[in-house]
Structure formats: C-alpha cells, structure tokens
Amino acid sequence: MSSDTLSNIFPGETTDIFESTLSDGQKFSEKKSFTKRSFCEFKDCQVEDNCEIDCSPDKKHRSSTDDSCTVRTKPDGTKIWYKNDKIHRDDDKPAIITSDGKTIWYVNGVIHRDNDLPAMVYSNGKKVWYQHNLVHRDHDKPALIDADGTKMWFRYGKYHRDNDLPAIEAGNGDLVWYKNGLLHRDGDKPSVKRANGKTIWCKNGLKHRDNDKPAYIDNNVIRWLQFGKMHRDNDKPAYVSNTGTLKWYVDDKLHRDNDLPAIINLGRSYFWYKDGLLHRDNDLPTVIDFHGEYQWHSYGKLHRDNDNPAIIRSSGICVWYLHGSFYRPDKKPPKIVDLEYYEICSVIIDRKHSHLYNYAKNLLNEHHKIYLTK
C-alpha cells in the first residue's frame, strides 16, 4: 500500500474516511471453467480480484503425497491446492502460489495461518495476518505490514487497537486511531493526525468534539462538528478558512438568525440562509456580490414581491422572479436594463451592510489567531 491512498476524511472533499489498502485477497472457486468476481469485505476495506480457474483434466494433478489433495494450475501458472473440494494445504504450506510470487495460506476453505505467521505474503514484502478468514493478529502486533512501512492493526476483521495507540501507522507519518472498526479516541485527543498537520477528532465513527472546540483543523480550514454534523452554538461560525470565508451551521444546515449572513466571503460576497435555504425577510437581498449583483430569495427560490426585480446586476440588468419562476405581472417584460435603478439600489444596499466588513474581518482575525497560527 502506498500511504498516499489515505484520503480526506470529509465527504465531498472526502469521501470515505480511508480507502482500503488490502488488495488482492482472493477466493478461488472450485467450479469448472468460469470467471468469478470475488470480494473479501471488512468494515473499512474491500478487496477485489478477478479469478479465472482452469480445471480441465490436463491441468488437474493428484498430489504425490496425499491422495485426497489436488493441485490445479491456472493458465498463468498460479497453483491452487484443494482437499475435499476446499482450498487447503497441510504442513503450514501455502495453498495458493500465484504467478507473481504471492503466497496465501488456507485451512478448510478459509484464509488462515497459525503460530502468528502471515497468511498472505506478497513478492514486494507486504504481509497480512488472518484468523479464520478475518484480518486479525493478537498481542498488539500489526495485522498488515506494507512494503512502504505502513502498519495496520486489526481485531477480527476491523481496525482496532487498545491502550490509546494508533491502529494505522502510515509510512508517511500519518496516524489513525480506531476502536472496533470506528474512528474513535477518548480524552479529547485527535483520532487522525496527518503528517501535513491536519488533525481530526472523532467519536464512535463520527466527527465530533465537545466544549466549542473544532473537530477538524488543517493549515487552511477549521470546522466545528457535533456527531458528524456541521454545528456550532451561540451564533459562532462552524467553518473558518484562511481565504476569508465564514459559514454558520445549525445541525448541518446553513442557518443564521437576527438577519445576519450565514456565509461571509470577506470582501467578496454575503449570503443569508434559513434552515439550509437562501432566505431573507423584509424585502432585503439574500445575496450581495461585491462585483455588483444582488439577489432576492424566499425559502430557496428566486422571488420578490411588489413587482420588484429579484436580480439586479451592475450592468443595469433587472430580472423578475416569482416563486422561482421567470415572471412579471401585468404582462410587463420580466427582464429590462435600468442602470439608474441599479445605482440607486446599490447605494442603499451597500450603506445598510457596510458594517459587515469590519465585523467579519475582526471575527476572522480572532479565529486565525487562536487556531491557524499555532
């Protein structure tokens, strides 16, 4: 496994928490002349292999030492040992030897090896320990050791390690803590520590941190999460970036009360949200773009009452919408150019919202000083 496969924890930036590095675990079918797509699944990893078995008579041989065993050879030279129609080999010998040098131990049809020895050994030095078809190793020893130095601890097929020790020690220095297959660490300690400085706190598999502390910190972004959802109380931003962006969330939805913007891009734009939808009362714009565009929304839809345009642009273009539809009453044109109207509106709107710039700047400076300058 290359430690570069450790991916971003956040969906959309990230998708799943970590990609598997267990590859090429194989189940070889004893049925004749067909291709099978097999999977060996664990909580956080999936192993896939295309396996074509040639069981024609000229490829099937009796063992010279055990009449109950057969050896089947694939066209590529891979050898598979069977006993009583199950993949099996005695005397601690591998039941599968692939053409590329990988060896796999089976006992009665399941991947298994005793005496604390690896059940999969790759030609590049990678080793994986199994017990009864599950990735597992006792005595706080890694169940996977990769060629790049990455080590992973498993307990009965799930990432796990006791005594507040990381279950993944990546070759690049990344450290990850798991408990029973879930990202978890006690004592307000991060469960993910990346070599690049990123730290993530998790509780029972969900991004979470108490006491108004951020659950995600990297060199560019700070995020507050509660049980996997973006959330922060007391009208504080749940997302702060070093590019000047602030976002307010309540239960994973963009939201802010008291007629304040839920997204502030310092010096660029403001957005007002209510329960995850663009919305603002009192005929005030939901979007203010510093390039000279204003928009009005009602519960997520472009809308403005009293025959006023829902979009106004610096070019003088005015566009009418009603409940999300391009519309103007009395058969009036729903799109016109009125530069004078834009200039009047922009003066009024900018004057009303001028205080937001200094407010946002001070808030950003405060958060940067605490979290991004350490």
From Swiss-Prot:
It comes from the Viruses. It comes from Acanthamoeba polyphaga mimivirus (APMV). This is Uncharacterized protein L111. Belongs to the mimivirus L41 family.
